[in-house]
C-alpha cells in the first residue's frame, strides 16, 4: 500500500523545480493513488504542517506537540508558560504554530498584509470571557528531539468578586415601628383631620358690611416681576390650578350687577375664596343634596330678578363739568349698531386695527389665570371678548356715559358662558374717587391685577386735579406687580404736525378725509389743558380732547409707585408683533388683513392710526 499524499509546500516545490536531487525522488508519488490523510485512522509517519501557512512554508518538517492535543479551533491559543510566537500572515483565523527551538523565527512582514490577530479567548488573556475547550486527538511522537515539550494547560480562574456587606449609614439606631397607638393619640389625630377637612367644617361667621355683602378675602400674593414670555400668549393654556367646578355652582352666572349697593346673593362673597371651595362647589362649607342645590339656584334667580335694576347715572351730588357733559352726551348719542352693521363702517379697517392693538396689549400684560380687571372708560364693552380670551375672573367696567355702560351690560348678558363676573358703573373716574360708586367688596385696596384705559385717558389732562385723581384711582386699586395699560394720542407727533402749519394759518387745522384735528392755540403755557377738537369719521364727532405731556405723565405715575415698562407707537407695535407666534395670526383672524395679506385700511386710515401709542406701567 502506498503512503498517503504528502502536503505540498512552497519551498519544496521551488527546490524541486530548480534542482533535480534527492528532493525530486522524495516528492514523487503515484498518479494512480489519491488518498487523503483524514481517511487514515492512524498517525502520519512524518511531521506535517498546515499547507499555506508561513510556518509550514519556512520549515516544512517542524512539529508542534500541541497540534496533537488541542483542537484546530483552539490551536492558536497559547498558555501562560509559553513565549510569544509570531502569528501567521496568511491565516485568517489567527492560529499560532510553534517553531523548532533551533530555528530563528522569520519576522512577520510589514505593510498592509501584516495581520494582527483579533482578541480571542486564550488562557493567557485574563480579559477573556470563554474557557478553553479541549478535543481529544491521537498522541504522536515528535520527530525532532529538540522540540519543546508542551506543559498541560491549567484553566485560570479570576479572583472572586468582592462582597460588600449591607451597612447603610443611619442617623439613628434602627427600631421597630410596631408600637401601640393610645386612645389620646387617636383622638388628637381625629381632631386634626376634622380641622383640615373642608367637608366637615362649619360655615365661617359672616362679617356683614353696611351694604349687606360679606367682607372679601385678602388679595393674593403680588407678583414681583413682569409676566414672562410663556404668560404672553393671547390664547392662554387650557389649565387651571384650582379644582374644576361647574360655573353655576361656583358663583351665580346670571346678568351682571350694574348698580352700586348690595349685590345679589350669588355674590355674597367677592372675590370668592377659591382655596376654601370643595370639588362639589359648596363654597359655604355645607353639603346639600342635589335638590337643595337646585332650590338654592332658583332662590338666587328669584332674588336677582327682584333686585335687578337698570344701570344708574351719576351718583347723587356728583357734578359734571361742561366739557365732561359734552363728552358723555356725545358717546350716549352713538347707537349700538352691532357686529354685522359695523362691517359697513367707512373706517372698518381702522377699527379692526385698533382692536388688534388692544388685543396685543391685553395678551402681553394680562394676568393669568383668573385675573381681576378694572376697565376705566369701558364704553360699550368692546373689550369684553378680549378679556374673556385672557380667562379673567372679575371685570369691573366704568364709564362717564351711562347709556354706553348699559349697552356694555347688555353685551355681557348676551355672551355665551363668559367665564367671569362683571360689574358696570356709570361714573366720572377722573373727577371723583372710585370709592364713591364701587360696592365695598370691589373697592378693596390692591385688589386688581390689571387696570386698563383705552382711548380715554387724555380726557383726564384737562387740569392737574383730574390727572392726579386718575393716577390715584389707578394706583390705589392696582396691586403690587399689577400692570396698568392704555392707549393715548401721541402728543409729540401732534405738536410736530401743528408746528408744520404756516404762521399765517389761523385755523390751526390738519388732517385728511378720515380725521381732522383743530387746535385752539399754537402756543400753550403749562402741561395741562392744551385742548384740541378731534373728528373721526363714524366714530368721534368734534369732541374736545387734551394733549398728554408724556414726561409729566411719567412723573405723576412715578410719584404713585408706577414704573414705565412699555411704550410704543402703533406702527412700532405692528412691526414688532406681525410675525410673532401669538399675535401675527390674529391679524387675519380679526380682519386686519384679508386672505391675500392685504390691509383693509387705506392711506388716510393708516395715518389716523399712527396718531396713537400704547403704554404699560407696573406698580412697584
Curated annotation (Swiss-Prot):
S-adenosyl-L-methionine binds at residues 358, 377, 399, 428, 454, 459. Coiled coil: none annotated. Residues 1-176, 193-304 are annotated as: Disordered. MRNA binds at residues 354-355. It is an enzyme of class 2 (transferase). Residues 45-60, 136-157 have a biased composition (Low complexity). Residues 29-44 have a biased composition (Polar residues). It is found in: Nucleus. The record marks 380, 386, 411, 458, 545, 612 as: mRNA cap binding. SUPFAM superfamilies: S-adenosyl-L-methionine-dependent methyltransferases. It holds the Pfam family mRNA_G-N7_MeTrfase. GO terms for biological process: 7-methylguanosine mRNA capping. Its EC number is 2.1.1.56. It catalyses: a 5'-end (5'-triphosphoguanosine)-ribonucleoside in mRNA + S-adenosyl-L-methionine = a 5'-end (N(7)-methyl 5'-triphosphoguanosine)-ribonucleoside in mRNA + S-adenosyl-L-homocysteine. One of its GO terms (molecular function) is RNA binding. Its main location: nucleus. Residues 345-620 form the mRNA cap 0 methyltransferase domain. CDD domains: AdoMet_MTases. Responsible for methylating the 5'-cap structure of mRNAs. This is mRNA cap guanine-N(7) methyltransferase.
Amino acid at each position: 500500500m502506498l503512503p498517503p499524499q504528502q502536503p505540498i509546500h512552497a519551498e519544496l516545490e521551488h527546490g524541486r523545480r530548480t534542482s533535480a536531487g534527492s528532493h525530486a525522488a522524495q516528492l514523487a508519488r503515484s498518479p494512480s493513488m489519491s488518498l487523503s490523510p483524514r481517511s487514515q485512522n492512524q498517525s502520519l509517519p512524518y511531521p506535517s504542517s498546515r499547507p499555506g501557512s508561513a510556518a509550514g512554508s519556512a520549515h516544512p518538517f517542524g512539529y508542534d506537540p500541541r497540534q496533537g492535543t488541542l483542537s484546530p479551533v483552539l490551536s492558536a491559543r497559547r498558555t501562560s508558560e509559553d513565549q510569544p510566537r509570531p502569528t501567521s500572515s496568511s491565516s485568517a483565523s489567527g492560529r499560532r504554530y510553534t517553531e523548532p527551538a533551533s530555528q530563528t523565527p522569520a519576522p512577520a512582514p510589514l505593510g498592509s498584509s501584516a495581520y494582527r490577530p483579533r482578541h480571542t479567548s486564550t488562557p493567557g488573556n485574563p480579559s477573556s470571557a470563554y474557557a478553553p475547550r479541549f478535543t481529544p486527538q491521537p498522541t504522536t511522537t515528535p520527530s525532532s528531539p529538540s522540540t519543546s515539550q508542551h506543559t498541560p494547560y491549567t484553566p485560570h480562574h479570576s479572583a472572586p468578586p468582592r462582597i460588600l456587606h449591607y451597612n447603610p449609614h443611619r442617623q439613628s439606631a434602627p427600631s421597630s415601628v410596631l408600637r401601640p397607638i393610645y386612645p389620646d393619640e387617636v383622638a388628637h389625630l381625629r381632631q386634626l383631620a376634622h380641622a383640615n377637612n373642608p367637608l366637615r367644617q362649619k360655615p365661617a361667621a359672616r362679617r356683614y358690611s353696611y351694604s349687606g355683602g360679606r367682607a372679601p378675602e385678602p388679595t393674593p400674593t403680588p407678583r414681583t416681576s413682569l409676566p414672562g414670555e410663556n404668560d404672553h400668549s393671547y390664547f392662554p393654556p387650557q389649565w387651571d390650578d384650582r379644582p374644576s367646578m361647574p360655573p353655576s355652582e361656583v358663583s351665580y352666572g346670571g346678568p351682571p350687577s350694574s348698580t352700586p349697593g348690595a349685590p345679589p346673593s350669588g355674590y355674597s362673597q367677592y372675590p370668592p375664596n377659591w382655596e376654601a371651595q370643595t370639588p362639589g362647589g359648596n363654597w359655604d362649607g355645607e353639603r346639600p343634596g342635589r335638590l337643595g342645590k337646585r332650590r338654592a339656584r332658583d332662590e338666587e334667580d328669584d332674588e336677582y330678578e327682584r333686585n335687578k335694576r337698570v344701570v344708574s347715572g351719576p351718583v347723587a351730588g356728583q357734578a359734571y363739568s361742561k366739557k365732561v357733559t359734552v363728552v358723555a352726551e356725545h358717546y350716549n348719542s352713538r347707537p349700538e349698531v352691532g357686529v354685522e352693521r359695523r362691517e359697513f363702517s367707512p373706517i372698518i379697517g381702522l377699527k379692526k386695527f385698533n382692536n388688534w392693538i388692544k388685543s396685543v396689549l391685553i395678551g402681553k400684560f394680562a394676568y393669568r389665570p383668573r385675573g381681576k380687571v378694572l376697565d376705566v372708560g369701558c364704553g360699550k364693552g368692546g373689550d369684553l371678548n378680549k378679556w374673556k380670551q385672557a380667562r379673567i375672573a372679575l371685570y369691573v367696567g366704568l364709564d362717564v356715559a351711562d347709556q354706553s355702560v348699559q349697552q356694555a351690560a347688555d353685551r355681557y348678558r348676551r355672551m355665551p358662558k363668559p367665564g367671569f363676573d362683571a360689574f358696570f358703573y356709570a361714573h366720572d373716574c377722573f373727577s371723583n374717587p372710585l370709592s364713591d360708586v364701587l360696592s365695598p367688596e370691589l373697592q378693596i385696596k390692591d385688589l386688581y391685577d390689571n387696570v386698563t384705559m383705552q382711548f380715554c385717558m387724555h380726557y383726564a389732562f384737562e387740569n392737574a386735579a383730574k390727572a392726579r385723581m386718575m393716577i390715584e384711582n389707578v394706583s390705589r386699586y392696582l396691586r403690587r406687580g399689577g400692570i396698568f395699560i392704555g392707549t393715548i394720542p401721541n402728543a409729540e407727533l401732534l405738536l410736530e404736525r401743528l408746528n408744520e402749519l404756516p404762521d399765517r394759518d389761523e385755523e390751526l387745522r390738519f388732517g385728511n378725509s378720515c380725521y381732522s384735528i383743530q387746535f385752539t392755540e399754537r402756543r400753550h403755557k403749562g402741561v395741562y389743558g392744551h385742548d384740541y377738537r378731534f373728528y373721526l369719521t363714524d366714530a368721534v364727532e368734534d369732541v374736545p380732547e387734551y394733549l398728554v405731556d408724556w414726561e409729566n405723565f411719567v412723573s405723576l405715575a412715578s410719584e404713585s409707585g408706577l414704573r414705565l415698562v412699555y411704550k410704543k407707537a402703533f406702527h412700532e407695535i405692528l412691526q414688532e408683533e406681525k410675525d410673532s407666534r401669538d399675535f401675527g395670526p390674529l391679524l387675519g383672524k380679526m380682519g386686519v388683513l384679508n386672505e391675500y395679506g392685504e390691509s383693509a385700511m387705506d392711506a388716510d386710515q393708516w395715518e389716523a392710526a399712527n396718531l396713537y401709542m400704547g403704554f404699560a406701567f407696573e406698580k412697584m
